[in-house]
Amino acid sequence: VHVIGCGAYARESFVSKVPIRGVADFEGVKVRSPEGLAADVFRRAGAAPVSMAGSETYGALEKGVIDAADNSAYANNDANGMHKIAKFPIYPGIHSTPILQFTIGEAVAEELSDAEMVALETWYLAAYNGLRQHFERLDRQLVARDKAAGEIEVIDWPREERDAMRLIAQEAWADFAAGSDLAKEVFDAHVSFMKEAGLL
């Protein structure tokens, strides 16, 4: 596989029917979460992770099956009506981000000329940056609209709470990485990248 590009195109917003202003507020909250590491992080924070498809999130929030959800970008949550029933979104989110990747087979990559590869990489970066800028602007516009209307409380965690959640996540990552040599290799690569990028 040859990677043309990958990256997060938006900052997710956490959907919630209850105010979650810091890690301690997760205690007992039923959170829709992907299985695996994400669920482990929420569990360690005191939440009760519930695994379900993203398409089931609205109905589960509406019926009280869950209280909150690791779901999508603010604009997507708004378009899907999430804020009509979950009036305490956390933005910027405190969890995973949506990732876009574009890969091609190594055999295909080897057949491309240098100019074709540059064109493909340039196209991807332009499309990716356009999408990222679009969602950043749209999310900010919608957050400003919702704050002004006063019907939704947009919660922005203070730095110390974000740092506390990050430490919980790092502990979960390290424990998972101890499970196999391959997991440790991936963990080390990610931690190295995050430190280099100033994220850790």
Cite the ranges covered by each PLM segment.
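N-terminal secretory/targeting leader peptides
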Residues: V1-L200
